[in-house]
Amino acid sequence: PELDLLASNHKKFEEIGVLPLCPSKQTADLCFDKYSMYLYLKNHGVNTPLTFHELDDFKAAYFKGEIQFPVFIKPRTGSGSVGAHKVNTMQDLENYYAENAFDYIIQEFMQGDCDADAYIDYYSKEVVSIFSKKKIETRIGGASKTISFKDQRLFDFVQSFMHLFDFAGAIDMDFFFRDGEYYLSEINPRFGGAYLHAYGAGVDFFKLIINNINGVTNEVRIGDYDEGVLMLMYDDVVITKEVDLLRDYHD
């Protein structure tokens, strides 16, 4: 909701000399509505998990063998993990829809999830930085333990679809990986809750923001970080390298 307000007043901010590092109204609306985003991605040939909105449409696909249980359901316009469930049977799925607690979408269940923080330059509209990490543990909708990795296939995938949107500044993306290909699940047009992992690994979006504020176009430096850097979130945050963690363990 806050992003919609900012995006709707994009030009007003610019008129008073404020740099609105937020998406356009159209892009913000797509990111907020997960089913609209799914349709948009499919129409443009972008890999994304098979998704249904209507229960009858899911049933038709299920009985044709196009999708299997388990599936994953979540609110069409939800955030975090509120209302999100793994569902193993048709009866359970029907019960969730009958309760009508949320306007659900049904998504094929995929494993191999990871995410990426990216920065889109305000002036060039190019992706100038990407930091990718695999999730080790997730709590309350956000990753609490992650490890950094690099994969040129993921970097290329992100760059292949970014022209379809109008972003500026930091974004957070969720992906799945299956059979050698990445699938885009969601885009949050804001700092991700686990951005501190990227920052701790040396990916400083704040420098990029300051450059844009000063009218400077940022250079593209994608994947400019170390692999094997862990973020371990407890009551506090620990950022370390995998090799150092193993060394401490063996010592």
Please identify what each model-predicted range represents.
Residues 50, 70-72, 103-106, 170-172, ...:
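A short linear hydrophobic-aromatic micro-motif
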Residues 41, 65-82, 102-112, 130-134:
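ATP-grasp fold ATP-binding core
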Residues 1-50:
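Conserved N-proximal alpha/beta basic substrate-recognition cap immediately N-terminal to
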Residues 181-183:
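Conserved protein kinase catalytic/activation segment
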Residues 60-66, 95:
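Short amphipathic alpha-helix with an adjacent loop that forms part of the alpha/beta core around
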Residues 24, 235-251:
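Non-catalytic, C-terminal membrane-associated alpha-helical segments of glycosyltransferases
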Residues 51-56, 85-88:
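Short acidic-hydrophobic, aromatic-tinged amphipathic segments that line or gate anion-handling sites
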